[in-house]
A protein has these predicted regions:
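Residue(s) in the substrate-gating loop at a strand-loop-helix junction
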Residues: 136
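C-terminal helical subdomain
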Residues: 179, 197-235
């Protein structure tokens, strides 16, 4: 795979950090973004010299614009933009407070919208590019009630992603739009969720390195939808059949 310039938000830990390290080993140039300066610097250090680390609050448009502009100033182009930043919460519907609602919507949804709004105009001018939005299996199958508002925010990410795909399909066919749907992943994401992470029915967690490896392949060979866990893809299909008597439409029926 030829060297690409890749922006990754939420790069200070979890999937973002693992993805960054794998891409760096393959010779790509990275622009890494997160709020936590110390942790972000440590990830950038593990990636080796020549990469860019930009302390970024993804819930602020001006920060996302600054991330884009700093990347273009350093590398002169952007090939791939990965909207990875996110935060979990463990609250049932009737337990969610206004502050928690705002936090989860801002980090999981607003940040994705801002990322799309700052990079897609550049991709359109350039005539090509690849946008990768991180969602969740729970956006398709709301399997656990205590992930209520998190699942809802990620469902909205799916809708935004598909709407953008429709907007660009005919006018800009060389701009790839990908949606990634992880199931459970062995990271600190659940531990750091607001309210912790209660025990309950769940898929066996995937190793974060496995998920990152699948995303590296997605960047090499773009496709509309990636379920990182085949079991979650099958459960999603079964959910649609059981609930609606039909298979999921469009890209959601793709592995």
């Amino acid at each position: 795979m030829e060297s690409k310039v890749i922006v990754i938000t939420g790069a200070s830990s979890g999937i973002g950090a693992a993805l960054a390290e794998k891409l760096a080993r393959k010779g790509h140039r990275l622009s890494l973004a997160a709020r936590r300066e110390k942790e972000l610097g440590e990830v950038a250090g593990r990636c080796g010299p020549g990469h860019l680390a930009v302390v970024t609050d993804v819930t602020k448009m001006e920060d996302m614009q600054r991330l884009r502009d700093a990347t273009l100033e350093r590398f002169d182009r952007i090939d791939v933009w990965v909207n990875n930043a996110g935060r979990g919460i463990s609250r049932k519907v009737l337990e969610v407070t206004d502050c928690e609602f705002d936090e989860i919507i801002n980090v999981n949804l607003r940040s994705v919208l801002y990322g799309m709004q700052v990079i897609i105009p550049y991709f359109r001018r350039r005539g090509r590019g690849h946008l990768v939005n991180l969602s969740s299996y729970l956006s398709i199958v709301p399997q656990v009630s205590y992930r209520s508002i998190y699942s809802a925010a990620k469902s909205a990410v799916n809708s935004l992603t598909e709407s953008l795909r429709i907007d660009l399909r005919d006018s800009h066919p060389d701009i790839a739009i990908s949606l990634v749907l992880p199931g459970g992943v062995s990271t600190d994401f659940a531990k750091n969720a607001l309210g912790g992470s209660p025990r309950g029915p769940w898929l066996k967690p995937q190793d974060v390195q496995e998920v990152a490896g699948l995303m590296v392949d997605l960047i090499r060979h773009p496709r509309p939808v990636l379920f990182t866990d085949p079991a979650s893809a099958e459960l999603a299909r079964a959910y649609f059949v059981d609930s609606y008597g039909k298979k999921p439409a469009g890209g959601f029926d793709q592995k």
